Amino acid sequence: MAEEAYPLFQQAVNLQPQVDLFQANLASCGVFLGKISEAKAIYTRLLKRFPNHQRNHYQLARLEKAQDETHLQQMLKVLEQTNNPPDRNIFIYFAIAKEYEDLGRWSEAFEYYKKGGDAVCSVARYDVKEDIELIDTIIRCCNKEWLNEPVTAAENSSEPVFVVGLPRTGTTLCERIISSHSEVETLGETLFFQMILRRESGVQSTQPISREMIEALLDKEPAAIAKGYMEQVAYRLHDKAYFIDKLPFNILYLGFFAKAFPKGKIVYLHRNPMDACFAMYKQIFTWAYKFSYSLED
């Protein structure tokens, strides 16, 4: 959707160039389209106006490999002058860490990655035990016997392809490769399948998915799940034979996907666990994948 959004952000900037949020959105969208030099110019210009804006420092640091300490020293100065508590420094911690890593200063890089991760953990209210219990429930419920039970499959004009795996394992690259085929389109990362599972389970919960939902879904008609999902994505489809949904968290729901879409495809990306975990540890996912901010989790 970045192709459609970019000219709209350009129009917003042209109409109100003094609004820094419009310019930041234009730069962020441009990164998705490979407009790196344009994005760099925007972030550099914004930081001249707002030198303490941590998120813009973070976005600028991500654009290219640091060749010297110029930007790094600017960020260290911001950190020293603002004197914020750790949970207000998350973006600049990760930005500083990234540039230290670019410069081969490994111990300093790890120090700041840890500061960033610890700061997120201090406010995240996350307990890894809950995720482990959910995964154990899925393994117990979505077993071989259940998967082999006969089902009535829904007929669809377009079949889904789930591209799944931990973040930073190559799901985005895989999505781009597959979607380059003329008979494939991509929806990007959506929550549609999870939403349908929540609805069909009939379980009321504040959790995105719960053990109770998983257990309740075992007796639900896979065809109803397929129908509900296809109704949700219909407005995004354009008469291609296949479409991709690449939300990494869909890996939890592959059993229900396999039963709902016997003709659907699953592409699972696997990467060396150490590489995958450390790559996640270095990334800000906003409030997703809370386990990634602690090496213990």
Predicted regions and their residues:
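PAPS-dependent sulfotransferase catalytic domain
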Residues: 33, 187, 192-193, 197-218, ...
